Amino acid sequence: GLAVMSEGYDGSGVGILLRDIGGPFAAMKHIPILSGIFSSSGLKRLDRFMMDRGFTTKYKVTFKANGARPTGVPKRDVYLVRAYDYPTDWEDYSQEALLRELMPIRLRLQEMGAAEKDMVVFSFWPDTIMIKEVGDPVAVADYLQLDRKDLTARVIMLQGRQNTNYEIDLYACHPFFLQGYATMTNGENTAFIQNRDFLMSRGFDGYHGYLSDSEVFTHSLHYLISYLGLGLECYKHGITPLNDDAIETHPDTAFLKHLKYACRSLIIDGPNCVIGCLPDTTLFMVQDRKKLRPGVIGGSDGTYVFSSEICGLDAVIPHRDKQHDFQPMHLDTAVVTPRRLKVELLCQADPLMVN
């Protein structure tokens, strides 16, 4: 699937996110996994930092390079994926309390890495692995042997290009992830500045970074669902609200008026196609009003593929019933729940399930 999309690559990078992980990690669903790239000195600093806080290593995977380093890929010491047992003095914490402790640790490690240029930390969260690298996606995937048998997952999010409006940076590679919420985007976010400034004003430390204008889609998803407590059906009402005339005739007029006004700085102008994943591994796809970026969903026998091109579906599930391929329109949120039975639609014109 990665190679067939190569016409759209520019060598700027590749990112892969794994959720609902199999193999050795399948028995470690509730403990945090740290993913990142480290120099030898950075790895020592990581070990000291984590031991000082009471974390102990449960299991680890390191990526051994396959052959010569591809053109454009910097020399790295260690690509690391490591699962940790929680500190023993946290054993009385609820699951919610445990999860609250993880993001500050990731942010602190990222700060340490930025200061010394010796570590890049992509994620620190249960049942989550993220690896990113600059360079040609197909060459990088072969170099890191991303098809290894001990690294499997039921949800794989992969994008072969980062935002190239700015300097190339590992943190700018899609997909983006925050506390169980993930997105990757095809397109440009022309409303980036107002989106970013609104999110950064919320007083939540995780709304941070923004080396890509597409990272705001992850954070706005987190804001609307986790921070405000709304459902997925409200995501598009937050970023692409109905026009005022349509709101006046909607069954939830008062609520949608208030949401549009309160979250007006989250509104996007496109062109964007966004693919996302929720903490329970529900997958979805949305389009902006202009619908100038392609997006299609197809599936067969419990396997669904979300892609910007039909050739991506053909490469992964060639024998599916193509009559059921679906391309969401601008009012749709196309959803595949964790049971992976069918594509369900949430339409902005319909009554909200919860408000």
Regions found by a protein language model. Give the residues of each.
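Conserved short alpha-helical segments that host acidic/polar catalytic motifs at enzyme active sites
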Residues: 1-355
